[in-house]
């Protein structure tokens, strides 16, 4: 009978630890006829609370010469304003700063929460806590909100003539132009979801294999890529809105 030597047993144990890293474990809440992912709602509420509390603290005692939290908040708002102005256009950007800013801050803090907050230490009846953007439902919802926003932008400015863009520069391109508007939210959602999920899985696997050494630089890299993903999503959302306002691709 074949028996494993100690090195093979150790290798088997490591493989078992890696295989225990699962995707798709959820805590389901029943809301009427629908089942929702409870852990996503919990972490989303935490992220929204962080944004609201920070905003209230920074703006409760505004000073002509900003300092501390107010200074940081004004820097963030200036960055978001410049981003929106560049993508949407100087004439139309002001009304879209709150939308683009909310998208950016929610995604940014959600992504960072996955790397900085030890969600998995909090035990649930089933499933486990993770960054809200680690769930495809969250990223699809954000992408659909972006789709609604750029359709609203085009229709509010041009009315029904907005749909004339689908036959530009030639009616032959009608199916392709329609398909493009469907692929925009898909590309936004899958890009964000894939990057955040991959980052968390890589860190989880490395922690199971080398608990102390390798995961730290990978977590730092994850923080950087998480910020980049938030910037890409907000930039593309603003660019799509700008395209709708201009009336062409």
Curated annotation (Swiss-Prot):
It is found in: Plastid, Chloroplast thylakoid membrane. Pfam families: ATP-synt_A. Key component of the proton channel; it plays a direct role in the translocation of protons across the membrane. It comes from the Eukaryota. Keywords: ATP synthesis, CF(0), Chloroplast, Hydrogen ion transport, Ion transport, Membrane, Plastid, Thylakoid, Transmembrane, Transmembrane helix, Transport. The lineage of its organism: Eukaryota, Viridiplantae, Streptophyta, Chlorokybophyceae, Chlorokybales. Coiled coil: none annotated. F-type ATPases have 2 components, CF(1) - the catalytic core - and CF(0) - the membrane proton channel. CF(1) has five subunits: alpha(3), beta(3), gamma(1), delta(1), epsilon(1). CF(0) has four main subunits: a, b, b' and c. This is ATP synthase subunit a, chloroplastic. Its main location: plastid.
């Amino acid at each position: 009978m074949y028996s494993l030597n100690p090195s093979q047993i150790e290798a088997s144990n490591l493989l078992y630890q890696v295989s225990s890293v699962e995707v798709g474990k959820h805590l389901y809440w029943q809301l009427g006829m629908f089942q929702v992912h409870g852990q996503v709602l919990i972490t989303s509420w935490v992220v929204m609370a962080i944004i609201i509390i920070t905003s209230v603290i920074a703006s409760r005692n505004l000073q002509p010469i900003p300092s501390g939290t107010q200074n940081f908040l004004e820097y963030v708002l200036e960055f978001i304003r410049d981003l929106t102005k560049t993508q949407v256009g100087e004439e139309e950007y002001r009304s879209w700063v709150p939308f683009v800013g909310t998208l950016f801050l929610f995604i940014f803090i959600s992504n960072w929460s996955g790397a900085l907050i030890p969600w998995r230490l909090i035990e649930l009846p089933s499933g486990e806590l993770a960054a809200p953007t680690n769930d495809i439902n969250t990223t699809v919802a954000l992408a659909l909100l972006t789709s609604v926003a750029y359709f609203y932008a085009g229709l509010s400015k041009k009315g029904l003539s907005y749909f004339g863009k689908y036959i530009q520069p030639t009616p032959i391109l009608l199916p392709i132009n329609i398909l493009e508007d469907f692929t925009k939210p898909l590309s936004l959602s899958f890009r964000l979801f894939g990057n955040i999920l991959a980052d968390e899985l890589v860190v989880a696997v490395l922690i199971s294999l080398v608990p102390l050494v390798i995961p730290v630089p990978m977590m730092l890299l994850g923080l950087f890529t998480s910020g980049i993903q938030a910037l890409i999503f907000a930039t593309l959302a603003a660019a799509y809105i700008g395209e709708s306002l201009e009336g062409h691709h």
